[in-house]
């Protein structure tokens, strides 16, 4: 417990919360060759490796993910949502924050329907999350 005189000398510091997507919180100045702190909702990146991994204990599947080098130079592991994808090495993708609960170390999602990541085909519901266009009506 702090005394009154200790608190007068130095007040209590408020807790600062850490960001859940640290790679989106800075950019890279190419001319000065140093990082600059500013947050972005998404960042562009290039796929280095596209592969699968198995989830944590009670679940069983082959989840698709990509290792992505972002425009600020950092490398992140990003999940590819939806059924089927056309991503391969050197594909340019848009990466947003958001972790995958049963994949350890995956803190980012690839945005479907942006850049080289095509939208999910034959999707009727929840289309905006998977970059699908409105299907044409048959007469």
UniProtKB/Swiss-Prot annotation:
Gene3D superfamilies: Nucleic acid-binding proteins
Keywords assigned: Ribonucleoprotein, Ribosomal protein, RNA-binding, rRNA-binding, tRNA-binding
Disulfide pattern: none
A family per Pfam: Ribosom_S12_S23
Record-stated family: Belongs to the universal ribosomal protein uS12 family.
Protein name from the UniProt record: Small ribosomal subunit protein uS12
Organism whose genome encodes this protein: Onion yellows phytoplasma (strain OY-M)
Region listing for Disordered, in residue ranges: 1-21
GO cellular component: a single term: small ribosomal subunit
Subunit structure, interactors included: Part of the 30S ribosomal subunit. Contacts proteins S8 and S17. May interact with IF1 in the 30S initiation complex.
Origin: domain of life: Bacteria
InterPro entries, alphabetized: NA-bd_OB-fold, Ribosomal_uS12, Ribosomal_uS12_bac
Family matches, as CDD domains: Ribosomal_S12
BP terms from Gene Ontology: translation
Gene Ontology molecular function: rRNA binding; structural constituent of ribosome; tRNA binding
Function field: With S4 and S5 plays an important role in translational accuracy. Interacts with and stabilizes bases of the 16S rRNA that are involved in tRNA selection in the A site and with the mRNA backbone. Located at the interface of the 30S and 50S subunits, it traverses the body of the 30S subunit contacting proteins on the other side and probably holding the rRNA structure together. The combined cluster of proteins S8, S12 and S17 appears to hold together the shoulder and platform of the 30S subunit.
Compositional bias segments (type: Basic residues): 8-18
